[in-house]
From Swiss-Prot:
Pfam families: GIDA
Cellular component aspect of the GO annotation: cytosol
Catalytic activity: uridine(54) in tRNA + (6R)-5,10-methylene-5,6,7,8-tetrahydrofolate + NADH + H(+) = 5-methyluridine(54) in tRNA + (6S)-5,6,7,8-tetrahydrofolate + NAD(+); uridine(54) in tRNA + (6R)-5,10-methylene-5,6,7,8-tetrahydrofolate + NADPH + H(+) = 5-methyluridine(54) in tRNA + (6S)-5,6,7,8-tetrahydrofolate + NADP(+)
Protein encoded by which gene: trmFO
Name by which UniProt lists this protein: Methylenetetrahydrofolate--tRNA-(uracil-5-)-methyltransferase TrmFO
Keyword Iron-sulfur: no
EC number: 2.1.1.74
Gene Ontology terms describing biological process: tRNA methylation; tRNA wobble uridine modification
InterPro entries (UniProt xref): FAD/NAD-bd_sf, MnmG-rel, MnmG-rel_CS, MnmG_N, TrmFO
GO molecular function, one term: flavin adenine dinucleotide binding
NCBIfam families: gid_trmFO, PRK05335.1
Tagged with keyword Protein biosynthesis: no
Protein family: Belongs to the MnmG family. TrmFO subfamily.
The organism of origin for this protein: Streptococcus suis (strain 05ZYH33)
Binding-site positions, FAD: G10, A11, G12, L13, A14, G15
Length: 444
């Protein structure tokens, strides 16, 4: 096979990152994206790296594993991290973006790169003319999904993922909410809608009896724990939401709060948080309220939240099926397939879960596709780093127990020596070692 370029299929977070990493190393890229010609059920635009679910890249501190992964990616010149930094919106200790401007920035940089040729159209066969990175995501078209399914030995893994509703901020009753971040961490970035016990109980009863949109009859309900529909969470017990998205701790009433309080308590019984969704502050999403309720039910029940009694929903919550591969049996730690070293996969379909993790997999796959192009040995990042631990986990866990995985400190190699008992200090030490090891690895 005469090598002239590398194919990347899919211009989501992973595909955009892979294409950029390949092109910056001087190799021409053919980037295929079907949106703009053929839509998916969940994407709203034809822009690259569209944020379909939340607009958050989660925690930014180095004592948070995803914060460490983001810092590692910054040091590896990630296009996704650069665009994210350029279009941040207030989110306390988290990193959130104006989703439209973020996607537009990635799209523009990819389109303007002289070595990247963007081809709009559906790919129905796995290309054999060049080294290829497939990053088509959980919403892969049926035709290509069949070919990937065949690689998977006919076994399909999937789970259901859901998105939260977005409301027009001008329709929020600001007298009943207050601006605050949990524990006052970072700037005051969230609108908080407090509930007393009576309000919460009424909300809970409405939620567990609400009508859900139907699934296909042959599909079981399997959810990723990190993006579980609020109604499914509620059915696990009346207290479940109080330890999850409606957790009130660290969100005390401000002294000047004029709305109804929960008796003499300083902290509400429950709190619903809303996070800014765009730079203008005209849109807010309901944090942790991903849902599969019918749209009429969403309006009826979510307008029970104080401050949202007259809210206009610019997007209702939706749910979609996410497919992922049997990565322990199919993939090398480099994201190349075991049977064909010229074929790479990246993104959520490999079993990494989350925006940042998907982009990180594209970064690693892109680098290794270039090394394959040059006939060089692949790069395997140290297990002491977040960007090395994640591919190690998804390719070395036991296949029958394989589930999508967010980055976390539990998958990063333990520190040498006695275990540090204080969790924050332990995570700080792991992060310090990770960044040191990454720098040393990059200079070899």
């Amino acid at each position: 096979m005469s090598q002239t370029h590398i194919n990347v299929i899919g211009a989501g977070l992973a595909g955009s990152e892979a294409a950029y990493q390949i092109a910056k190393r001087g190799i021409p890229v053919k980037l295929y994206e079907m949106r703009g010609v053929k839509p998916t059920p969940q994407h709203k635009t034809d822009k690259f790296a569209e944020l379909v679910c939340s607009n958050s890249f989660r925690g930014d501190s180095l004592t948070n594993a995803v914060g460490l992964l983001k810092e590692e990616m910054r040091r590896l010149d990630s296009i996704i991290m650069r665009a994210g930094e350029a279009h941040r919106v207030p989110a306390g200790g988290a990193m959130a973006m104006d989703r439209e401007n973020f996607s537009q920035a990635v799209t523009d940089e990819i389109h303007n790169h002289p070595l990247i040729e963007v081809i709009r159209g559906e790919i129905t066969e796995i290309p054999e003319d060049a080294i290829t990175v497939i990053a088509t995501g959980p919403l892969t078209s049926d035709a290509l999904a069949e070919k990937i399914h065949a690689l998977n030995g006919g076994d399909g893994f999937y789970f259901y993922d859901a998105a939260a509703p977005i409301v027009d901020s001008s329709t929020i009753n600001m007298d009943l909410v207050y601006l605050k971040s949990r524990y006052d961490k970072g700037e005051a970035a969230y609108l908080n809608a407090p509930m007393n016990k009576e309000q919460f109980n009424a909300f809970y009863e409405a939620l567990i009896s609400a009508e859900e949109a139907p699934l296909n009859s042959f599909e079981k309900e399997k959810y990723f724990e990190g993006c579980m529909p609020i109604e499914v969470m509620a059915k696990r017990g009346i207290k479940t939401m109080l330890y999850g998205p409606m957790k009130p701790v660290g969100l005390e009433y401000p002294e000047d709060y004029k709305g109804p309080r929960d008796g003499e308590y300083k902290t509400p019984y429950a709190v619903v948080q809303l996070r800014q969704d765009n730079a203008a502050g005209s849109l807010y999403n309901i944090v942790g309220f991903q849902t599969h309720l019918k749209w009429g039910e969403q309006k009826r029940i979510f307008q029970m939240i104080p401050g949202l009694e007259n809210a206009e929903f610019v997007r209702y919550g939706v749910m979609h099926r996410n497919s992922y591969m049997d990565s322990p049996n199919l993939l090398e730690q480099t994201f190349a397939t075991k049977k064909n070293p010229n074929l790479f996969f990246a993104g959520q379909m490999t079993g990494v879960e989350g925006y940042v993790e998907s982009a990180a997999s594209g970064l690693v796959a892109g680098i290794n596709a270039v090394r394959r192009f040059h006939g060089e040995e692949p790069v395997i990042f140290p297990q002491t780093t977040a960007i090395g631990a994640l591919p190690f986990y998804i390719t070395h866990t036991e296949s029958k127990h394989f589930q999508p995985m967010n980055v976390n400190f539990g998958i990063i190699k333990e520190l040498d020596g006695p275990r540090i008992r204080d969790k924050k200090e332990r995570y700080e030490a792991i992060a310090e070692r990770s960044l040191k090891d990454l720098e040393e690895f990059l200079t070899v």
